[in-house]
């Protein structure tokens, strides 16, 4: 059973990366490292720190600043350059894969340009993946209009090439498309798991929202991917309960 927890649980708390890894090493074998805030693995000394633990890692690219869907070419290219920086860190900590947000488009008028930019970025990312030898995955996004890849759109899926998907169950529930994503399970290499009440992206403990995981637990079990719990700091006290609930689902 490949079960892990993201360090995002400790974002904006008084915990540093060492504190987070100490807590998680007692509970799981897989941990998702981030590149933001107090847990930024790219900060001085944190790469060596991560290397010192007996853990297997995935790596989440920065949540902010990057936009692979920007039709402003300089911004798109700088975003790709930063992905290269993240991949260098991934190699150093022996990360299995990296997770990348697809970008955003604020104005509907610009959507087609943004989609074309994203497709161009997917092509570039295939070349970058081949260069670094680390699997790149694109995460499906929650139900806010500005985000790209909220649904398994044909134009995006057909242009993934050798890239894979990180299926975020909570995001998919908000978009009412869990089944649609599970139909392309061969494209899924990684799974983010958390709960919500169907209104916004709460990142709750499994069982504390409205997602009926039993409806698709057979499909989850069949997918050869790390099931990565991704909670927010308001759910720190629920960590052990969430791990137990996920184990029960995957049993």
UniProtKB/Swiss-Prot annotation:
Query: Entry's Pfam families?
Result: AP_endonuc_2
Q: Which domain of life is it from?
A: Archaea
The record's listing under InterPro entries reads: IolE/XylAMocC-like, Xyl_isomerase-like_sf, Xyl_isomerase-like_TIM-brl
The protein's matches in SUPFAM superfamilies, at most eight in alphabetical order, are given as: Xylose isomerase-like
Instruction: Give the similarity note.
Output: To M.jannaschii MJ1311.
PANTHER family named in the record? HYDROXYPYRUVATE ISOMERASE (PTHR12110), XYLOSE ISOMERASE-LIKE TIM BARREL DOMAIN-CONTAINING PROTEIN (PTHR12110:SF21)
Its name, as the record gives it, is Uncharacterized protein MJ1614
